[in-house]
Regions:
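PLP-dependent amino-acid enzyme catalytic core
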Residues: 4-349
Length: 349
C-alpha cells in the first residue's frame, strides 16, 4: 500500500517527522477540551471551549515541542539539548529531557518566576541565569551550542518546535469533530501561533478540513511587537514589560512567520492591559476551576474583548497554554490573602 492510499490517522504523533520508537515514555498531549457551562452561559456562547494544555506533564503546551525535540535527539544520537526560555520552554525541556535521558543546559533571564527555575532544577537541568532579559538568554544559548555542541531547542530557531506544537490543532479537530470558527491564543515569540497554523494547514492539505479557522493572536500591551508589525510590517525592538512573563519578548524570533500566517489566513491581533489579563485569570479560576498562568489567561481575556464582533453561535476555542502554579507571584496581584489568624470560630466576622 503506498502512502497516499493509507487511511488518515487520528493520532497526532503520526503527523510528526520522527518515528514513534524514538519518543520518550512521557504522556504529552491528549489534554482535555473543556466546555464549562458557567462560562458559555455567562457569555451566551454555547460553543465556547477551552483547550487546557496546562495539564501537560510539566504544566505547559511547550511539552509538545520538547517531546519532538527529544525524539529527534535520540534518533540522531544527540545527548545534550541547549535551550533559552522565559521559563516554560526550559522547564518543559528539562522534564521531557529527564524522561528521555538527555542532558539539558538551560538559559533563563534572572527575572524568570522562581517556580519555573525550581521546577527545571528538580528535573536535573543545568541552569544559567542571564543578567538582562530573554533576548540575552537566547543569544547566550546560541553561542553556547555553537561553542560546546549539543542541539539547540530554542523557540523559532529549531524547526521542530513549530512541528511539535502543531499537534494541538490536530487534537482540537479530533475532539470537536470539526474545525472551529475561532481560536484564541496568547502570543510572544509567535511559535505557538505558527504551530497552530501548521497543524490546521496540514489538515487542510490532507482534505480533513475545508477551511482554516480565524485565529486571534493575543498580546500584552507591554509586549506587542507582532501587533505593531501588523500595521507597520516591521519589527522594531522595544523593551517588553508585562505581568504575563511567558509572552514577554522584546523582538519575537518567529515574528515574520507569525505575521505572514496572520495576514495569509485572515487572522487578528489585539493587545490587553495587565488588568484585563489578571481579571480574566481570576474569572477562569473562580468560575470553572481552570487556574491558568497570566499568559494563558490572556487568550480568554482576548475572547472577552473580541466576542462583540463574533456570532454567538460560532465555535470558539480558547487555548490555555500554561498552568497557574507556574507564576504564583503574578496570580497574587489581584487577590488578598488573609493576614489575621484565629483561635476559635467566635473570632470570625
Amino acid at each position: 500500500m503506498c502512502i497516499r492510499d493509507r487511511p488518515i490517522s487520528d493520532d497526532p504523533l503520526d503527523y510528526l517527522p520522527v518515528e514513534r520508537e524514538f519518543f520518550p515514555d512521557i504522556p504529552v498531549g491528549n489534554t482535555p477540551l473543556w466546555h464549562p457551562e458557567r462560562l458559555f452561559k455567562k457569555h451566551d456562547f454555547p460553543e465556547l471551549y477551552f483547550k487546557d494544555d496546562g495539564l501537560n506533564p510539566t504544566g505547559s503546551l511547550k511539552d509538545r515541542a520538547s517531546l519532538l525535540v527529544a525524539a529527534f535527539a535520540k534518533k540522531n544520537y544527540i545527548d545534550e539539548v541547549v535551550v533559552a526560555s522565559t521559563g516554560n520552554a526550559g522547564s518543559s525541556m528539562a522534564g521531557v529531557g529527564a524522561a528521555a535521558g538527555l542532558k539539558v543546559k538551560l538559559f533563563l533571564p534572572k527575572t524568570a518566576p522562581p517556580a519555573k527555575m525550581i521546577q527545571s532544577l528538580q528535573y536535573g537541568a543545568d541552569l544559567v541565569l542571564a543578567e538582562k532579559n530573554y533576548d540575552q538568554a537566547f543569544a547566550l544559548s546560541i553561542q553556547y551550542s555553537k561553542k560546546f555542541g549539543g542541539m539547540n531547542r530554542n523557540t523559532a530557531y529549531n524547526p521542530m518546535t513549530i512541528e511539535g506544537k502543531k499537534t494541538v490543532s490536530i487534537e482540537i479537530f479530533n475532539q470537536l469533530g470539526r474545525v472551529p470558527e475561532h481560536v484564541f491564543v496568547s502570543v510572544g515569540d509567535g511559535v505557538i501561533l505558527s504551530g497552530l497554523y501548521k497543524g490546521f494547514r496540514d489538515l487542510l492539505q490532507l482534505k480533513q478540513i475545508s477551511r482554516m479557522p480565524e485565529i486571534h493572536a493575543i498580546q500584552a500591551s507591554g509586549s506587542s511587537a507582532i501587533f505593531r508589525a501588523m500595521s507597520s510590517g516591521e519589527f522594531q525592538e522595544q523593551p517588553a514589560e508585562t505581568v504575563a512573563d511567558s509572552i514577554s519578548v522584546n523582538t519575537p524570533s518567529n515574528g515574520y512567520l507569525a505575521l505572514k500566517n496572520l495576514k495569509a489566513y485572515g487572522g487578528h491581533c489585539i493587545t490587553l492591559t495587565a488588568k484585563e489579563i489578571l481579571s480574566a485569570q481570576k474569572e477562569l479560576s473562580s468560575s470553572c476551576g481552570l487556574f491558568s498562568e497570566p499568559a494563558a489567561a490572556a487568550a480568554y481575556a482576548g475572547f472577552i474583548k473580541q466576542k462583540q464582533y463574533l456570532h454567538s453561535n460560532s465555535t470558539c476555542v480558547v487555548l490555555l497554554t500554561g498552568n497557574g502554579l507556574k507564576d504564583i507571584n503574578s496570580a497574587s496581584k489581584i487577590i488578598v490573602t488573609p493576614s489575621k489568624t484565629i483561635n476559635s470560630l467566635d473570632e470570625l466576622n
